[in-house]
């Protein structure tokens, strides 16, 4: 308020000085202009009347009154007598006696001399006598000098006043500017109603914003009634809230925290008069943060961290606490896609004006970086070895390597002592741990740093501490490599033995499978029949790749393939064989024909039996399907790895001078491993020779080693065969269902002898018999003749 008053007075003073200067300037100019104007007119008029006469100056009387020509009555231009302005004889010098200066401009002007007036010779000569004896230039009258002095003083006074006024206004402006700067940085001198529009508090149950009155007039007449603003403001500390008594409607609402950089004024006594504004503080570049005026909160319970005042926020983005001036607690970042300029028509415009509040203290305890080593009650965690801050550890090895090793140690639940004992004594450890240790072995530089470290081990991380203990053991990682070989060799040997055994069984079963050979025979004969008359006919053998092409040749119906035909023929052939086994008679076909059951039920049973036999080929050659997934190159690589690891272990055993449990365990292992490896090597060579002979048995000798390709071909053919058998089985069920209906219609013909079942299965045999009977009849007929 005082600042505004001073500004108002300064502006008023400037206006007053400007008006005064204008008035004085106009008055002085009028006087000067009046005097000069009269003199100029008089001189110009006289010169005009007497252009060739020499002027005679009269002392102090050469002052022509302006009203003679300027303010006198205008001459009449009507016809009649009037003053003559034509050139004529110069007037007598004494004629200037009547031109005395007027006493004041308000007096009536002197009359103009007329022709009827008496001659100038009759006037008193005492007035002009002195002037006739002293000719010379006229002197300026004293009245003019006096006016010049007054004008000069007036100009000096106006200029001085203007300069002083400018200096005063400049000083006032500088004082006000410095005062504003101090108020913007430091504490306030008086109360101001510059509170935020939205009032928030920690424990507020009414989440409604209080809008401060923005139309308060600071220079209104009613400012005297609001002079005691400080007396009407009370700062009450209740937990983390401040309350104001400025309006009855906002009495129950907790206010916001004070803006950053400002402190609350001290509460004045209730009956005390309004305090005078203190003098402005000296300007400071950066004043310290103001102390808290409110009383401190009650002492927190033991072990709990003191709460900060104003622990709620509605999205304050400031990095500095508005009360203490200290930086806010650093929280974990939340990565999102920030929108640059949201439109006012969007939903965010309404959300920004909401009344949502959150507990800032709880948020800092959950997502703060500094509280990671404290639990919910603020107490330190009991398991300090697992929850120590990684910033306290000394980092020696790679960060990712240390992290992976620490996770593995916790996952396997293996202590450092157990690992050290196993390395020193040759005990068994998890294979995964040993493999990870070899992969994450420190480099030569890291190992040197670990060896040279002589500080406290607790200052190292779990991974560095573990590796520090390991590098102190002689040949630690060579021991780990040998220990891994000792543990994994038995498993690798078992896998190799199983694979080699599978290959041997597959070769034997494939060569000794009667049904598989029957299939090859059927395919060979069928193919030769189809290739009659071509260069492909009369084949004696074919490669097993041909088996995979049987399903590509389709019949005239577009459904039945050559593979279907071969399978049906094999089923019929196996049905006949099943009949032979049941009759236990292998003497001749005629005996079988006479003793066989020719009923339709028996025929169907034989057909289903043949289908089961063909379907069982897949089960019979199951080892061939397992042998197809074995990689011959993988077998050779595994044997090579075993040989290399065994060589390294033997060389490492030679470098160990002192006897220890690990040295004795390694020596015994190498002795057993040599015997196992020799047997595996011999067995692998024998099995591979058997595989090659089997491939030559079916494919013939080839220039290149096909390896285990034979088993892959047979596996694919068995898959195709199994699919065709399922289709034939489904077709047989449909045929049987329709055959039952036909049997019911032929019950009347049951007395007639049914044809032989072999004729039904093999109609070609019946035709041959009919042909043979006809030939015999012809021979009998021709013989008597």
From Swiss-Prot:
> Which residue ranges have biased composition labelled Acidic residues?
773-785
The UniProt regions of compositional bias labelled Low complexity, in chain numbering, are 115-134
Do you know which InterPro entries this protein is assigned to? FH2_Formin (IPR015425), FH2_Formin_sf (IPR042201), Formin-like_plant (IPR027643)
Q: Quick one: where's region Disordered?
A: 96-145, 184-228, 241-329, 730-785
Q: Where is each FH2 domain found?
A: 321-747
Which is a GO BP term held by this UniProt record?
A: actin cytoskeleton organization
Q: Which key words are in the record?
A: Membrane, Signal, Transmembrane, Transmembrane helix
Q: Where in the cell is it found?
A: Membrane
Q: Where is the composition biased (Pro residues)?
A: 256-303
Ranges of compositional bias, category Polar residues: 201-223, 745-754
Any signal peptide, and if so, which residues?
1-20
User: Which SMART domains does the record associate with it?
Assistant: FH2
| Residue ranges of the TM segments | 154-174
Q: Name one GO cellular component term.
A: membrane
Specify the protein's topology with respect to the membrane.
Answer: Single-pass membrane protein
Q: Name one GO molecular function term.
A: actin filament binding
The similarity comment for this entry is: Belongs to the formin-like family. Class-I subfamily.
The protein's role, per its UniProt record: Acts as actin nucleation factor that directs the formation of actin cables and polarized growth in pollen tubes.
Q: What is this protein called?
A: Formin-like protein 3
């Amino acid at each position: 308020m005082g600042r505004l008053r001073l500004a108002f007075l300064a502006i008023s003073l400037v206006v007053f000085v400007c008006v005064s200067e204008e008035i004085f300037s106009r008055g002085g100019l009028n006087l000067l202009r009046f005097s000069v104007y009269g003199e100029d007119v008089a001189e110009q008029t006289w010169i005009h009347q007497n252009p060739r006469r020499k002027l005679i100056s009269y002392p102090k009387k050469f002052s022509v009154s302006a009203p003679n020509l300027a303010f006198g009555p205008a001459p009449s231009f009507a016809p009649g007598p009037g003053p003559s302005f034509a050139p004529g004889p110069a007037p007598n010098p004494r004629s200037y006696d009547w031109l005395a200066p007027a006493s004041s401009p308000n007096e009536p002007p002197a009359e103009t001399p007329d022709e009827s007036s008496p001659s100038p010779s009759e006037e008193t000569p005492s007035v002009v006598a002195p002037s006739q004896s002293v000719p010379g230039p006229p002197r300026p009258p004293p009245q003019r000098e006096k006016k010049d002095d007054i004008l000069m003083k007036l100009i000096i006074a106006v200029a001085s006043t203007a300069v002083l006024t400018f200096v005063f206004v400049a000083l006032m402006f500088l004082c006000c500017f410095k005062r504003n700067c101090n108020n913007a940085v430091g504490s306030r001198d008086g109360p101001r109603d510059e509170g935020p529009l939205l009032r928030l508090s920690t424990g507020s149950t009414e989440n409604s914003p209080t809008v401060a009155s923005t139309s308060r007039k600071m220079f209104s007449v009613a400012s005297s009634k609001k002079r005691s603003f400080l007396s009407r403001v009370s700062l009450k500390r209740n937990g983390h809230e401040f309350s104001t008594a400025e309006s009855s409607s906002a009495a129950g609402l907790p206010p916001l925290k004070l803006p950053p950089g400002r402190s609350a004024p001290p509460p004045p006594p209730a009956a005390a008069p309004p305090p005078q504004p203190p003098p402005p503080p000296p300007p400071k570049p950066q004043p310290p943060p103001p102390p808290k005026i409110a009383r401190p909160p009650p002492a927190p319970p033991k072990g709990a961290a003191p709460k900060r005042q104003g622990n709620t926020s509605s999205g304050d983005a400031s990095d500095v606490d508005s009360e203490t001036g200290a930086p806010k607690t650093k929280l974990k970042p939340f990565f999102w896609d920030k929108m640059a300029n949201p439109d006012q028509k969007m939903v965010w415009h309404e959300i920004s004006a909401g009344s949502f509040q959150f507990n800032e203290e709880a948020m800092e305890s959950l997502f703060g970086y500094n509280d990671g080593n404290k639990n919910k009650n603020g107490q330190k965690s009991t398991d300090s070895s697992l929850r120590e801050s990684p910033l306290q550890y000394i980092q020696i090895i790679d960060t990712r390597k240390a992290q992976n090793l620490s996770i593995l140690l916790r996952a396997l639940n293996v202590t450092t002592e157990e690992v050290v004992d196993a390395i020193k004594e040759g005990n068994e450890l998890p294979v995964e741990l040993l493999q990870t240790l070899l992969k994450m072995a420190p480099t030569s530089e890291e190992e040197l740093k670990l060896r040279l470290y002589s500080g406290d081990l607790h200052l190292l991380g779990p991974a560095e501490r573990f590796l520090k203990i390991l590098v102190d053991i002689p040949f630690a990682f060579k021991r780990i490599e040998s220990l891994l070989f000792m543990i994994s060799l038995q498993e690798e040997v078992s896998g190799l033995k199983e694979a080699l055994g599978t290959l041997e069984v597959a070769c034997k079963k494939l060569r000794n499978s009667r049904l598989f050979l029957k299939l090859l025979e059927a395919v060979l004969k069928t193919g030769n029949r189809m290739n009659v008359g071509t260069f492909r006919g009369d084949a004696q053998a074919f490669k097993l790749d041909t088996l995979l092409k049987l399903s590509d040749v389709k019949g005239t119906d577009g459904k039945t393939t050559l593979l279907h035909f071969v399978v049906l023929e094999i089923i019929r052939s196996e049905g006949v064989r099943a009949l032979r086994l049941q009759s236990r008679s292998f003497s001749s076909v005629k005996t079988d024909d006479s003793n066989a059951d020719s009923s339709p039920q028996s025929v169907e049973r034989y057909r289903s039996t043949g289908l089961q036999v063909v379907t069982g080929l897949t089960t019979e050659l199951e080892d061939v399907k397992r042998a197809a997934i074995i990689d011959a190159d993988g077998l050779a690589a595994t044997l090579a790895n075993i040989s290399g690891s065994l060589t390294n272990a033997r060389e490492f055993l030679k470098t160990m001078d002192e006897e220890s449990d690990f040295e004795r365990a390694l020596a015994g292992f190498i002795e057993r491993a040599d015997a196992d490896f020799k047997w595996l090597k011999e067995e692998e060579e024998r099995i591979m020779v058997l595989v090659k002979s089997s491939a030559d048995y079916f494919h013939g000798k080839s220039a290149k080693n096909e390896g285990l390709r034979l088993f892959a071909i047979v596996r694919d053919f068995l898959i195709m065969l199994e699919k065709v058998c399922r289709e034939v089985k489904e077709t047989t069920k449909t045929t049987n269902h329709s055959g039952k209906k036909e049997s019911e219609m032929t019950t009347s013909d049951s007395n007639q002898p049914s044809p032989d079942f072999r004729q039904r299965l093999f109609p070609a045999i019946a035709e041959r018999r009919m042909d043979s009977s006809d030939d015999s009849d012809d021979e009998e007929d021709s013989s008597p003749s």
